[in-house]
Design a protein with these regions (language model features):
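N-terminal Lys/Arg-rich, disordered targeting/topogenic segments
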Residues: 1-11
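Basic, ligand-binding patches in group-transfer machinery
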Residues: 11-184
Length: 184
């Protein structure tokens, strides 16, 4: 009987230590997922891409929300295309310094495809897996401290989908940011 009393506190400590370890592991996984979700996915040269517009693709591009909160830019929208299936779609940003020309490099954001209702987008038989959610931590964007603006574009399967499709401009003045425009 005396041994049972001694083992109960030991068991309690083991259970508490295991619970604390599980909480630490869960916090680490959440932190890694956040870092991954807000990391850039590289750059690509505009000259390596074929320039096109949503109209030329028989598609409709919309940006539903663009916001900066807690140092993270989040974009939600869709590129509705007819019967496409799986797509490699990325949101890209093109930098233009104040008083200068747009750069050739397109900075690609981490972009996740999501299902959306395409009924009101004007494309018949559009694939419902055409929505996107993109995010980036603003301090990870190039051109820190420079004044200028980023313009949002879509990059899909070797094509730069532009023509003001998204209508989003992200202005930078020193370390402050302003989101302007958007198609909806």
């Amino acid at each position: 009987m005396m041994e049972e009393r001694k083992s109960a506190p030991v068991m309690r400590r083991v259970v508490l230590a295991a619970a604390a370890l599980m909480l630490c592991a869960a916090a680490l996984v959440c932190a890694l997922l956040y870092v991954n979700a807000t990391t850039l996915r590289g750059t690509v040269s505009r000259t390596a891409l074929t320039l096109t517009t949503p109209d030329e693709l028989g598609a409709a591009a919309e940006l539903w929300s663009a916001e900066t909160a807690h140092g993270v830019l989040k974009l939600r929208g869709a590129l509705a295309r007819r019967g496409i299936g799986a797509v490699d779609l990325r949101v890209g940003l093109i930098w233009k310094p104040d008083g200068g020309a747009e750069e050739d490099a397109v900075t690609l954001l981490n972009t996740q495809m999501v299902r959306v209702d395409t009924a009101g987008m004007g494309v018949q038989d559009a694939d419902d897996h055409c929505g996107f959610v993109a995010a980036v931590k603003l301090k990870r964007l190039p051109h820190r401290g420079e004044n200028g603006q980023y313009r949002a574009v879509l990059v899909s399967e070797g094509q730069l989908i532009d023509g003001g499709a998204l209508g989003l401009t992200l202005r930078r003045q020193g370390e402050s940011w302003t989101v302007e425009g958007g198609s909806r």
